[in-house]
């Protein structure tokens, strides 16, 4: 079939298998161009099909020749209906990894569930014995709690008072004022249940109990802080409470891993275009201004550049891992540079529908958004008839 982008609000309903494959190849080429990383050799990635999790899988495999197991929850394609981008990404990744002689297997299912945890543990036990790195990178809006059976839904709201600021519809370029009403207490509880650290802790407990963590194993989860400009809706809102919980969980996990000298870290990453960030009011406008400035300064990074730097310059230098005063790894250091944030704040006050094409990088934002779904890649013939039914080798 001919596959074109079909939009509904902040979601693209279609994805392109050949474009997703090109995305994987581009990321692999980047990692190879940066040389070898003396990293982990057996890696579990929970949330492995898109964004930072996918880039972590690619960096481990093609930077350190690691065997990888990826867990994700994606929609397989049917005849006449494309699958989700994460499905195509994972199919392409496995294909490339196997061609390179690397071990790569995937599990498609709800990572919050006991069943998927058990399936993953069994696979590690039979194929790898133990893992020395666990990446936790889930980005789900809902979680069915495996113990209570409660379905929790996260919300993105300010706490205590309503919040008004500018936002942009990145499809039309229209800048408008938006007001977000404050959350209630239940919203906070639900958001922490979905996006906090409880499930990360459960995974690590199960892995340790089953003796599947190698001595000195490391686990890393991803977080975001951002500037004062976005803090009411992000770091000081419901999602910020979840991130606080995630960060506190790192210390609890480290305590639980003392017998194997294991360590848990949260890495604070930069703002990037993702399916999740596109749905958060205010953030797309911030990102389009940030991109413009970081590109002008020559310090812009996408997912793969961020994760390559995390692995090469922070996690695997042979030295102690550098952290901030709260024990977090900071690869948002370039985004948060005072001069860059100052320029963003200046542009923010000037941003209107009329000025944004000039002062922001809306074109870059749109391109990155379409890239998430396999569109707008050079070297892909989007007019060609494409087979939408693609299998993942280890799942088929």
For each feature predicted by the language model, list its residue ranges.
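The beta1-alpha1 cofactor-binding region of Rossmann-like NAD(H)/NADP(H)-dependent oxidoreductases
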Residues: 108-120
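A glycine-rich helix->loop->beta "capping" turn
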Residues: 119-148
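Glycine-rich phosphate-binding loop and adjoining beta1-alpha1-beta2 segment
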Residues: 65-105, 110
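Gly/Ser/Thr-rich loops at beta-strand to alpha-helix junctions
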Residues: 47-54, 112-114, 139-143, 225-229
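NAD(P)H-dependent oxidoreductase Rossmann-fold/reductase module
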Residues: 2-25, 98-99, 229-396
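Rossmann-fold scaffold of SDR-type NAD(P)-dependent oxidoreductases
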Residues: 46, 131-139, 151, 218-223
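Canonical Rossmann dinucleotide-binding motif of NAD(H)/NADP(H)-dependent dehydrogenases/reductases
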Residues: 35-73, 77
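Catalytic loop of short-chain dehydrogenase/reductase
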Residues: 153-262, 268-291
